[in-house]
């Protein structure tokens, strides 16, 4: 109790031991005070004594290592976000390209009413005019009068699918239809089912 009443003795201890005010490299020590919160400490010596200098070095290394880990974690997360942004940009570019192609195909000359689900064949005249026909190059044979540019299937959302992608697109649509039918289907009985809860 005599130590608590003699703050000067505490200052002497601090001066003799030469406690540094703060640790370097970003680390900082807690401020030293003999009366924290206005209350005198029982033993200021045991609470304010200077530690091993190696402890201060370890503290600074720990702070530096924490900074490195935080920076590495932030970099990893930003890398994932950047990859997602790049993927979304590619998807957006493809959506715009498909929309531009579909709009152009809808403006191609055609003497028949186009119906979703059918395949139409795109030809080009010598004059440069493009037109749709329901006659395929195979049906024309060697007597095809114009250049064949490609075949497209008109989907029910009025988008166009190139002939080489029809099978893959139909598989996607079939899978989506299956998922929608399963999610919309309701169970035959709407009453509570207690089967298995009682013997």
From Swiss-Prot:
GO molecular function: identical protein binding
InterPro entries: DUF2452
Keywords for this protein: Coiled coil
Coiled coil: 71-101
Superkingdom of origin: Eukaryota
Signal peptide feature range: none
One Pfam family from the record: DUF2452
Residue span of region Disordered: 1-30
Protein name: Uncharacterized protein C1orf50
Organism: Homo sapiens
Gene: C1orf50
């Amino acid at each position: 109790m005599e130590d608590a009443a003699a703050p000067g003795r505490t200052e002497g201890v601090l001066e003799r031991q030469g406690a540094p005010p703060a640790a370097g490299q970003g680390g900082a020590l807690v401020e030293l005070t003999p009366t924290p919160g206005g209350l005198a400490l029982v033993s200021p010596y045991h609470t304010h004594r200077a530690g091993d200098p190696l402890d201060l070095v370890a503290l600074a290394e720990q702070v530096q290592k924490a900074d490195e880990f935080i920076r590495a974690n932030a970099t990893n997360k930003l890398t994932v976000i950047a990859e997602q942004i790049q993927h979304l940009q590619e998807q957006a570019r493809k959506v715009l390209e498909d929309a531009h192609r579909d709009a152009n195909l809808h403006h191609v000359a055609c003497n028949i009413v186009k119906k979703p689900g059918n395949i139409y064949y795109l030809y080009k005249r010598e004059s440069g005019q493009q037109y749709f026909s329901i006659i395929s190059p195979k049906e024309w044979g060697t007597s095809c009068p114009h250049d064949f540019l490609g075949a497209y299937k008109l989907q029910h959302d009025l988008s166009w699918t190139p002939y080489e992608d029809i099978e893959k697109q139909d598989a996607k649509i079939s899978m989506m239809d299956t998922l929608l039918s399963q999610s919309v289907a309701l169970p035959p009985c709407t009453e509570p089912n207690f089967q298995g809860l009682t013997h």
